[in-house]
């Protein structure tokens, strides 16, 4: 079974949305942990997995240029639209958008980045390994 570009983009968008939801949830868990109420809301495993996910994303961000990271945070994590954050130059916006999309394609689909990390979503869990 082969996917069209539209189907592939839709699948990638859903994966990206799921990843960002996990990232936001992880930030919330750690914020509550800092306020000493996380254990009342989440168990220790949730807190540890949240730390791992945030570490994983931040480690990956450290490999990118600052403008690209800022763009990813603004668009994908904070949900801001380009007009909200002053990307008036369409060429600049397109370049950043391409860089951000390339990053997430790599992040979501390349198992080497997720090598030996466990990411859970509710009761579903998966372990990714690098078979290359």
Curated annotation (Swiss-Prot):
Extract the NCBIfam families matched here.
MPN403_MG284_C (NF045770)
What name goes with this protein? Uncharacterized protein MG284
Species whose genome carries this gene:
Mycoplasma genitalium (strain ATCC 33530 / DSM 19775 / NCTC 10195 / G37) (Mycoplasmoides genitalium)
């Amino acid at each position: 079974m082969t996917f069209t570009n539209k189907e592939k983009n839709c699948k990638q968008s859903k994966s990206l949305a799921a990843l960002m939801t996990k990232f936001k949830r992880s930030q919330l868990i750690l914020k509550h942990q800092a306020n000493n109420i996380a254990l009342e809301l989440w168990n220790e495993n949730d807190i540890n997995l949240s730390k791992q996910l945030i570490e994983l994303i931040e480690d990956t961000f450290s490999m990118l240029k600052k403008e690209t990271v800022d763009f990813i945070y603004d668009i994908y994590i904070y949900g801001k639209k380009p007009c909200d954050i002053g990307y008036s130059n369409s060429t600049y916006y397109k370049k950043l958008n391409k860089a951000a999309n390339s990053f997430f394609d790599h992040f979501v689909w390349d198992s080497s980045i997720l090598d030996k990390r466990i990411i859970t979503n509710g009761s579903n869990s998966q372990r990714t390994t690098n078979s290359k």
